[in-house]
């Protein structure tokens, strides 16, 4: 599921779209959408059926990767999205998991896993979600396979779902450190109890894909 290595560029200097280093987890959705449109899928999908017809070829070409449960995270039962992301976003999930596990170990805590609650959406699924979620805008970064949601109040100890204030604190510290490195853009969505995260792609990666 994971690529061998993450791009070694300085994301704050070499990002494909403008980004500043900050420890605040409150990036505007419009900025996340800008990064998604530049770094993600060049064409989004109108319907879930359209996506299913195209997904095998996109995976074969390494444009998309299927995201599956691993030692770093669990994947929720996705009702309004598909478990696929661009390789750079999958790499980011791995790096987040590695950093989270390292910080948990340093504090003598259990090896908690975080929970991914949303990934790639089609226009159809985004429209359906908008009926229930006020945060679901018509044109979403989720449609470009660059963006995922992670629950901030649910963590897994083995296969046991828990709320752990200590795990939440360590995970938040992990996110702050990685946001300061400009690895992603992030917004805490209180209505959905999740972190809305968009991967930052560097210019070098985009040039290689052209």
Show which residues each predicted segment covers.
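Alpha-helical scaffolding within the catalytic cores
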Residues: 130-137
């Amino acid at each position: 599921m994971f690529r061998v290595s993450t791009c070694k560029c300085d994301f704050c200097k070499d990002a494909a779209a403008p980004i500043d280093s900050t420890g605040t987890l409150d990036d505007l959705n419009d900025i996340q959408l800008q990064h998604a449109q530049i770094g993600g899928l060049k064409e989004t999908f109108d319907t879930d059926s359209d996506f299913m017809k195209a997904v095998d070829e996109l995976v074969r070409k390494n444009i998309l990767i299927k995201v599956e449960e691993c030692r770093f995270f669990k994947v929720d039962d996705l009702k309004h999205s598909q478990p696929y992301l661009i390789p750079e976003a999958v790499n980011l999930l791995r790096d987040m998991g590695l950093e989270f596990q390292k910080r948990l170990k340093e504090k003598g805590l259990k090896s908690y896993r975080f929970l991914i609650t949303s990934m790639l959406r089609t226009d159809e699924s985004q429209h359906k979600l908008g009926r229930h979620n006020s945060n679901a805008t018509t044109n979403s970064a989720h449609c470009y396979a660059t963006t995922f949601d992670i629950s901030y109040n649910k963590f897994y100890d083995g296969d046991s779902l828990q709320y752990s204030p200590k795990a939440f604190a360590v995970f938040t510290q992990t996110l702050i450190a990685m946001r300061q490195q400009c690895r992603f853009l992030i917004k805490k969505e209180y209505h959905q109890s999740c972190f809305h995260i968009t991967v930052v792609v560097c210019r070098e990666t985009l040039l290689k894909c052209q």
